[in-house]
Amino acid sequence: DITLVEPAAITEDKSAINAADPLIKDAVTGSTGVGSVAAPLVYNGMVIVGITGVGYGLHLEDALKKNGQLSAVIGFAGKYGQPGFMAAFDASNGAEKWRFETTKKGWEGDFVEKTAYGVPLRRDVTKEKANAPQFGDAWRFGGGSIWHSPAVDSERGLIYFGTGNPSPQSMGAGRPGDNLYTVSLVALEAATGKLVWHFQQVPHDMWGYDVASSPTLFDVTIDGKTIPAVGQASKVGWYFVNDR
């Protein structure tokens, strides 16, 4: 068997916020809540698969609880999540060959004010930059689940997949920056896991616009020129076509 995730040091336990709820008595297990929902890709002697469940936890500090009760949820910065990742394992023995984490140190990016296709993000970039030093480790809890199997271009030796929302999902104050490589279409070298390129559909996502559907590979003709393309149906309601 291939073990994808080791239990986190800090996880759900008897001190969890809702552990005393009679409706879920004895349901607190200590599980991280992380798993894989997509079929793995078997390619060139490797099993390639991503993890999910890293972008939706209720990430609250114990200090935010008052008298054992939680008075509010919206507006709190997050912790106790983890980066999502795509990983390759040796198909013969399960040994991990490479891992690409979807959030990394430096995930703040360029603090862009528009998407790559020109839609204003209406971000307070000045405030985000001022807060960045305070949240320098936010990428360690950054989310970026992978909800589908990757597409493979055997001619180029590349795989393509989309990533989920950053964590915490709808609260961006604790994660300044573009939150690379969440909500992105990502291309990796299949043999090494090295990043070749990415296209971030929504930087600093606040709305849960996961790149959740599987990419499709095809050729497209533009002005008489045939271009190898990768297409992806997005949650923003557009179908994106990128040059592979």
Regions found by a protein language model. Name each.
Residues D1-R244:
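Noncatalytic, solvent-exposed loop/strand surfaces
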